[in-house]
């Protein structure tokens, strides 16, 4: 929105040329989203407390979690609001990739909101029925996948980029739709599984978003894309503003979500943020790098799959409890230790993911 205003006023006031620079808008994006989150946080928490919208805690979970019962949840609303407002302010709204991320963010946020609402307001512990949750997740992902394929099929935008191999970039064809679907839905649910401790999900999300901001900038710059042997996709440069908005909103939320948490993001936040990271990975053609940078999310998801599979096949559990962060809690690790160590792992994996751009 502001970039349109700048283009209108630039002939009369040269100062407005500043608003057209991507670097300036990226910095403005992170600061705007951060300030919005910090401003909305206390007001939202107070409102959630008044409405008695508190966290539901499993009776079979770690005993340390019983004290979290009643802590305000659905705080993801402020994350999404901060991101959407910031993107509408600072991004180029003529860019279709920006709208692709916003559609997934808002759509998955709506699914998560209904799920949270049924759990904490209607007191239905099951929330949104699983098949309906996956139906709407799938529907949104497929709509976006088909739209993106129609927009960029048989171009660099539908190639598969394989880390460490600069000459391996096969054209996916219709498999692009399948890959896009699984990346968006899979990442959404992976972040949702990770969101079990104070600040555990939001900080890796911030780190991965920061990593994708760098990748989006390189992918959208013809010189750097050529130098790094990655596809040049012009529209991706504007995703830098989207990624920095996620970083700013996430850091603002962490101010209130850090241990001991004053608010939880709920499914409205985790499903939406995961879906957004998934579609960004697709747009910058780095789905495989997402597996590396989002290694904490992958680890949490695999722990659940292995736990369920082992119990059904052998009648035995591999972990004391899944997702794996609960396993370490039950081993006696204090919650802050689990959280910070997972943050460290995430930071290292994001750096490794960024290194794959050069190591080819």
Swiss-Prot record:
Cofactor(s) the protein requires to work: Mg(2+)
Record keywords, A-Z: Cell cycle, Cell division, Cell inner membrane, Cell membrane, Cell shape, Cell wall biogenesis/degradation, Magnesium, Membrane, Metal-binding, Peptidoglycan synthesis, Transferase, Transmembrane, Transmembrane helix
Membrane-spanning parts: 21-41, 73-93, 94-114, 132-152, 168-188, 199-219, 239-259, 263-283, 288-308, 338-358
Enzyme Commission number: 2.7.8.13
Known pathway: Cell wall biogenesis; peptidoglycan biosynthesis
GO biological processes: cell division; cell wall organization; peptidoglycan biosynthetic process; regulation of cell shape
Topology relative to the membrane: Multi-pass membrane protein
Compartments reported by the entry: Cell inner membrane
Biological role: Catalyzes the initial step of the lipid cycle reactions in the biosynthesis of the cell wall peptidoglycan: transfers peptidoglycan precursor phospho-MurNAc-pentapeptide from UDP-MurNAc-pentapeptide onto the lipid carrier undecaprenyl phosphate, yielding undecaprenyl-pyrophosphoryl-MurNAc-pentapeptide, known as lipid I.
The protein's name: Phospho-N-acetylmuramoyl-pentapeptide-transferase
Organism for this UniProt entry: Vibrio atlanticus (strain LGP32)
Lineage of producing organism: Bacteria, Pseudomonadati, Pseudomonadota, Gammaproteobacteria, Vibrionales
Gene behind this protein: mraY
């Amino acid at each position: 929105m502001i970039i349109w205003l700048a283009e209108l006023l630039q002939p009369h006031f040269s100062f407005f040329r500043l608003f057209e620079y991507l670097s300036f808008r990226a910095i403005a994006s992170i600061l705007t989203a951060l300030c919005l989150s910090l401003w909305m946080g206390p007001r939202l928490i107070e409102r959630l407390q008044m409405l008695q919208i508190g966290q539901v805690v499993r009776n079979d979970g770690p005993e340390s979690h019983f004290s979290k019962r009643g802590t305000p949840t659905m705080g993801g609303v402020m994350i999404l609001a901060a991101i959407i407002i910031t993107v509408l302010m600072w991004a180029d709204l003529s860019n279709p990739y920006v709208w692709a991320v916003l559609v997934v963010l808002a759509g998955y946020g709506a699914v998560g909101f209904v799920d949270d609402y049924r759990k904490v307001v209607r007191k239905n512990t099951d929330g949104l029925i699983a098949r309906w949750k996956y139906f709407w997740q799938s529907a949104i992902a497929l709509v976006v996948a088909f739209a993106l394929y129609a927009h960029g099929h048989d171009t660099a935008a539908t190639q598969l980029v394989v880390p460490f191999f600069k000459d391996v970039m096969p054209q996916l064809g219709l498999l692009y739709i399948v890959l896009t679907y699984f990346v968006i839905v899979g990442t959404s649910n992976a972040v949702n599984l990770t969101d079990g401790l104070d600040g555990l999900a939001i900080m890796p999300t911030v780190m991965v978003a920061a990593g994708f901001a760098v990748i989006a900038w390189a992918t959208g710059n013809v010189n750097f894309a050529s130098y790094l042997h990655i596809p040049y996709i012009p529209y991706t440069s504007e995703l830098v503003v989207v990624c920095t908005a996620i970083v700013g909103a996430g850091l603002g939320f962490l101010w209130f979500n850090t241990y001991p948490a004053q608010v939880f993001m709920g499914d409205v936040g985790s499903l939406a943020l995961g879906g957004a990271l998934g579609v960004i990975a697709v747009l910058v053609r780095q789905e495989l790098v997402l597996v590396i940078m989002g290694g904490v999310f992958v680890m949490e998801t695999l722990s659940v799959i292995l736990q369920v599979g082992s119990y059904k096949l052998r009648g035995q559990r591999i972990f004391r409890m899944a997702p794996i962060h609960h396993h370490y809690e039950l081993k006696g690790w204090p919650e802050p230790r689990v959280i910070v160590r997972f943050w460290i792992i995430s930071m290292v994996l994001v750096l490794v993911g960024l290194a794959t751009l050069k190591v080819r």
